[in-house]
Every structure is written in structure tokens, then in C-alpha cells.
Amino acid sequence: MKDKVVLAYSGGLDTTAIIPWLKETYDYDVICCCINCGQGEELDGLDERAKLSGASKLYIEDICDEFSEDYIVPCVQAGAVYEHKYLLGTAMARPGIAKKLVEIARKEGAVAICHGATGKGNDQIRFELGIKALAPDIKVIAPWRQDNWKMDSREAEIEYCKAHGIDLPFGTDSSYSRDRNLWHISHEGLELEDPSQEPNYDHLLVLSVTPEHAPDEGEYVTMTFEKGVPTSVNGKKMKVADIIRELNRLGGKHGIGIIDIVENRVVGMKSRGVYETPGGTILMEAHDQLEELCLDRATMEVKKEMGNKLAQVVYEGKWFTPLREAIQAFVESTQEYVTGEVKFKLYKGNIIKAGTTSPYSLYSESLASFTTGDLYDHHDADGFITLFGLPLKVRAMKLLELENKKNN
């Protein structure tokens, strides 16, 4: 009986060409595994394609609920955003995929796991760190990093497939490199490789329209949260995955969440991408608005630092680490009272606040009002400012003393 390898399979040209290459190079029995994180119609016809390409079996595993609840929610609660813009759509999905690949490999008794990530990108790191953390005994094969992988173009891959009896309708024309899941869709390549060029949004966008093509009338949306977890949209209770789908629909219609960024990859190079994250952008903003009411300043300050750190940890593929667990534990402790309702208006790329309520709100109208109230005596500010400004006053007095000595 041949040894088995589990291939992370998308159905695209790269992973299709890898199937005969694995059989030819290693004489493995190839088990394809496609992890559904919300790719949609990209999954159509995969079973036939995998078998025509020489795979002995195909698993299609739906992890949309796990992805949304176990990976997206913790990042939303933390406010994890990489380099101030990127909402981690691809990075958040990779640990769940790695976990499922390991599960299938264990089930099949496979000796290796193979992925089709290139040697220039972040995904090779994310997949392999996840596999190392969960299954250090399983071999990882990365064809793009091997000398005996000779295919350096789409044309070469198509010819290789045809030579091995695989004649599938893959086009040779260049197109955007895309990654789609429940949370977002990313675009790289073509004109985006030149930072001086404006993206061709008419051909690029899939989930969204540009703000200038959005409706001229705004749309109000209401969301509820319980302990930092979204529970409903416009009064309708839903699973987190369905909330994201609905927010994608609403946000995409109004041009929300289109970003064009140059980011620093883990491997050291800069890359440019356009990301569509309409639902994610809305969800992050709504959660932030609720936290403004419910969290004290000191907690918010530390939580912001932890959110930035978590973004880096997730981006670098270090999900299965004690550090991620510790950060997540802290963040979860801050969410105990992040419960309430957030209302906002979507209008031409903008999310406009329209009211926030919470039974745990720390906002006190009697304290914040400019009128006289019983809870706050304006005279109390005298002593506070004296003590709060004492370090500044002491330093200024010392500088004045030194200046006087110098002049005398």
C-alpha cells in the first residue's frame, strides 16, 4: 500500500498540477482536502476535477461556523488590525485550515501534508507553523520551494497537466490572484504590482461597489452584541457566520471596506493588495462603538496594545502559541460587559454613528453635562490639576533655577 499525502486543494491550476507531481515525485496516494471558509461558488465541480487530476479521494470540509466563532470573533473583540488597515482576512483563516488538514491526515494515516503556497508569500509560514504546532511528526511538502518543481508559469503548468492526461479548461491569460472567504476577498497582481497605478475597480471588485456608485440614500442598520459577540442584525438573531454574510451584503452595496494597502510581509518584502471587507469593517466599527461606552480608559489603552500585538501574532502565523492564548484570555475578560445595541448609517463608503445603548454604559449624562450636577463639583478639578500637573511644574521650576544660575 502506498503512503498517503493530504493536499490542501483549491481546485485552481497550481494545486491541480501538484496532484500528478506528487504521484510522480513521491509515488504517494493523494488525498485532496478543500476547506470551505466561505469561498462560495469556487467550490463547484471540485470533486470531478480532483478525481480527473488523479486524486484518490476529496474531502470538502465546511468550517464557516468554526472560522467565524473561533477565529474571527476573538480578533474582532481584540480590535486586531495589522498595520492600521488590514483586517486579517487571509491570516485568520489559515490556522483553521491547518487544523483541519492535520485532522484529515490523522484520519487517513497520511505521512505528509502538502500545500501550494509560493516561497515568497506569508501563507507558507502560516500553514507550516500551524502544522508544526499540531503535528510535529508529519512531513510538510511545499513544491514551490523544491528544485524539482519546474513549472514557473501558467503555461508550463497547463502543459504539465496535459502531458499527464489532465485536460481541464484553465485559461492562460493572467488574472488577479484572489483569496476569498467569509470575511473578505483579497486581490493582488496585474496593475496592483505598480503602487503608482490606480486599481481598475470596474474589473477588480467582487463583493462591493465603489462609493461613487453606491446608492445616493443612506441605510440605517442596528446590531446587538452580548459579551462582545454579535447576535443580531436589524432585530433578526443569527449565527455569527450569517451576520457576516448579511453585513457583507449591506456593506458591499454601500461601498464599505475597500482598502488599497502596501503591507510588510513576514518574509521581508512589501506587497500591495486591494481588500474588500465590507461586513468585517462594519462589525469591527460597531464593536468599537459599543466598547466606547462600556470599557474604562485604562482597560481600553492596554487592550489597544494587545490588539496590535494579536494582529502581528495572527499575521505571522503564530495562532497555536501560548502568547495568542494569553492575549485572547485577557481580551475575553474585557468583554464581560460589552453588551448592547449599536445603530449606524451606511452611506457611500462611510459608517456614520447613529446611537449606542448598553445596560453597562459607563457614560453618565449628569457627569458629562456642562450644567451643574450633584455628582461632580467643578472645584474638585483644582486639586486634581495641581497634582496631575506637578511633574511638569517641578521640571519647569528646575529649568528656571538653572537658567537663573547661568545668567548670574
From Swiss-Prot:
Pathway entry: Amino-acid biosynthesis; L-arginine biosynthesis; L-arginine from L-ornithine and carbamoyl phosphate: step 2/3
Its EC number(s): 6.3.4.5
Entry-linked Pfam families: Arginosuc_syn_C, Arginosuc_synth
Gene Ontology biological process terms, A to Z: argininosuccinate metabolic process; L-arginine biosynthetic process; urea cycle
Gene Ontology CC terms: cytoplasm
UniProt-listed CDD domains: ASS
Reactions performed catalytically: L-citrulline + L-aspartate + ATP = 2-(N(omega)-L-arginino)succinate + AMP + diphosphate + H(+)
Principal subcellular localization: cytoplasm
Binding positions for L-citrulline per the UniProt entry: Y86, N122, R126, S177, S186, E263, Y275
Superkingdom as given in the UniProt entry: Bacteria
Binding annotation for L-aspartate: T118, N122, D123
UniProt keyword list: Amino-acid biosynthesis, Arginine biosynthesis, ATP-binding, Cytoplasm, Ligase, Nucleotide-binding
GO molecular function: argininosuccinate synthase activity; ATP binding
EC class: ligase
Localization of this protein: Cytoplasm
Residue positions binding ATP: A8, Y9, S10, G11, G12, L13, D14, T15, T16, G116
InterPro entries with a match to the protein in the record: Arginosuc_syn_C, Arginosuc_syn_N, Arginosuc_synth, Arginosuc_synth_CS, Arginosuc_synth_type_1_subfam, AS_cat/multimer_dom_body, Rossmann-like_a/b/a_fold
Quaternary structure and interacting proteins, as annotated: Homotetramer.
Family indicated by similarity: Belongs to the argininosuccinate synthase family. Type 1 subfamily.
Protein name: Argininosuccinate synthase
Taxonomic source organism: Agathobacter rectalis (strain ATCC 33656 / DSM 3377 / JCM 17463 / KCTC 5835 / VPI 0990)
Gene of this entry: argG
